[in-house]
Curated annotation (Swiss-Prot):
Belongs to the bacterial ribosomal protein bL36 family. GO terms for biological process: translation. GO terms for cellular component: ribonucleoprotein complex; ribosome. This is Large ribosomal subunit protein bL36. The gene is rpmJ. Signal peptide: none annotated. The keyword Translocase does not apply. It comes from Caulobacter sp. (strain K31). GO terms for molecular function: structural constituent of ribosome. The keyword Ribosomal protein applies.
């Protein structure tokens, strides 16, 4: 999982990427292709 300062560009890398917020941390999750996982914060 990559830690990034900006996730907006990562969300558009794959059409199944979803932006999720858990406990103040923003995550990009992708069920079909897990190598696109990222987090911020």
């Amino acid at each position: 999982m990559k830690v990034r300062s900006s996730l907006k560009s990562l969300k558009s890398r794959h059409r199944d990427c979803k932006l999720v917020r858990r406990k103040g941390v923003v995550y990009i999750i992708n069920k079909t292709d897990p190598r696109f996982k990222a987090k911020q914060g």
